[in-house]
């Protein structure tokens, strides 16, 4: 069963009623890579290993679930209702929704042991993996087998902007510094095209993809780099009329939101959670109604599927530190 309403859940969540266990450092650790000092990666798959000592595992009676704040969290609580019921049935646990208001808040919640299952946006996934012990398990898959989305640069249909070069001197909405399609990828890709954000055009952080999109619709911004999937869902919900926006540029695909678990959940519980994802039937579900292009949850590999995202982040000078996470939190909010 699941526990409404969102406001009450948020209060309970914040005062720490959710059962949590402190993250324990793996010691000694011969291989860590980019992971925070509290984690270890002995098997070399780039994600945190489960603690060898079962005393370091957390097995709460209530599992807390969150979805990336690409839009208002309230939009998705109802959409994930069917899935959370399915998750409760397969795990035998109570499921509580956590309405994360920023990427940083979501990462910090898992790092502190207060969040156990999450859908994390593509860009922040690397922060969640390295700072919070997040282990990506599945992603939403289309009928054609793809799990990706693209970076789209959108502008109003009446705008004179036709190319990336036309962004010079304009007011452009970026999402937040941790967003792959909303900031990190544009900075790397646009510079290669001869246009440097902050130098050639004014960057205005909107905080969320929907804010950027509606800002362009309402002509508060001249353009915005955003995730194609968010544009598609908002148009399908009637948030703006077809033809209102024009796509100036579209990238090759990136992996979409990673769904996964805290690294220190017991192995049998992690397996039950994975099975809840892969056995969920999107047909006639609220989740299927919201994500109309999705057929199922499919297994993923952070090491493989996030290779290009990590490359762009490294080339952009991104480092996965608590200090940078705090900066992202302030920007995102």
Can you name each region flagged by the protein language model?
Residues 9-19:
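Bacterial N-terminal signal peptides
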Residues 21-105, 289-333:
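N-terminal hydrophobic or amphipathic helices and topogenic motifs
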Residues 65-88, 123, 146-214, 221-223, ...:
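Bilobed "Venus flytrap"/periplasmic-binding protein-like clamshell domains
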Residues 68, 143-152, 239-277, 281, ...:
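Periplasmic-binding protein-like
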Residues 97-108, 197-214, 253-255:
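Short helix-initiation/N-cap motifs at beta->coil->alpha
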Residues 98-133, 231-236:
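Pocket-flanking alpha-helical
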Residues 111-120, 133-134, 170-172, 217-226:
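Alpha-to-beta junction loops
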Residues 128-140, 234-248:
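Ligand-binding "clamshell"
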